């Protein structure tokens, strides 16, 4: 048993967990819809792994993974999910190219503040309503996925789950803002491409569609404004309630309420949001459901448990894996983030970077951030966040946006259609340019 947890074989449950998440929705969609079935898979792979870890002398590693990573991770996602689920933006304005581009730019900026899921869910319905009279609108949803559900969430650990995990591993809250240049270049290029493309399609619209769009006009209106205050509370809590600011939170024998002070505050903000937001806003206008966050909690229990021995193996054998260039970390993280979940992918490559020898680390120069060379951490962050937009399964909000668009009557591209008609020809060249300039 001890030999298993310290060998490459220990990575099999982790690989099977990620493979199931990636493949099951494609080959057994109806069966996979049930959270009970997801829980079955998580327990089937997670419980035996946990037993092996305990017997193999890695109980401390398992405890750290569950109590130090999993619980804070899920509580943050719960807070963002509930609070943003209490904000509703409605209205129908003219779907001119500059209006659509403004919507996408707003979501791109908000993604770093309220998370990619929050920004996407806040804006996707107003975008679809605004464009309902237009015939050509698939491209708007595709760029929405790229900008609002992925690329925008780079500047804070709230933006995308992999960034929060790297924050828990020692990267400072403000460090993520240092990636503003690739964030700005990527967003600026995608917005410029979108504006040109939307202008082209707008000029191709039949005059009846344009006329209908001009006639049907409803001013924008925001419901649940109090939740913006709770959202500010989340940002301040993550930024200032941590061991870096309050050293007692990191002490081994500190009281539980001190260790989990951040989580206690986040849960309090979550409850305030839930009980002070009108049910009509949350459940009728936003069609709020607990199912998505339950799904995340269930799947990530399996991911975090099976990931424990895999991370230990990668860290111990990092020097022999042959990753010795920044671009290799960028594209390796990006490739796996495209088809697997980007959070465990980012954590795995952080473990690889942390396991490099001192001489290997010195070759990258610069400061160490979260225990790894800064340029490698940037490569991992950029690869995880940006490449999540390469497929529908690269990041959680992608499928949610696709489903809402299809409910509105938009015929979205297939899994491979999305890649060959959009991500490979539009996104990948931009990502390559980012690597050439910054990495």
Where does each model-flagged region fall?
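Transmembrane helical segments that form the transport core of multi-pass membrane transport proteins
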Residues: 231-356
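Membrane-interfacial helix-loop connectors
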Residues: 111, 122-135, 140-142, 165-181, ...
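Transmembrane alpha-helix boundary signature
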Residues: 49-69, 81-96, 109-122, 308-317, ...
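Intrinsically disordered, low-complexity non-transmembrane regions of multi-pass membrane transporters
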Residues: 1-20, 45-49, 198-231, 273-291, ...
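Alpha-helical transmembrane segments
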Residues: 65-77, 175-193, 253-268, 332-338, ...
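Interfacial loop-to-helix junctions that mark the boundaries of transmembrane helices
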Residues: 1-10, 31-40, 60-72, 173-183, ...
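Juxtamembrane and boundary regions of transmembrane helices in multi-pass small-molecule transporters
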Residues: 31, 155-156, 165, 174-222, ...
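Hydrophobic mid-bilayer segments of alpha-helices in multi-pass membrane transport proteins
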Residues: 10-21, 35-51, 70-80, 105, ...
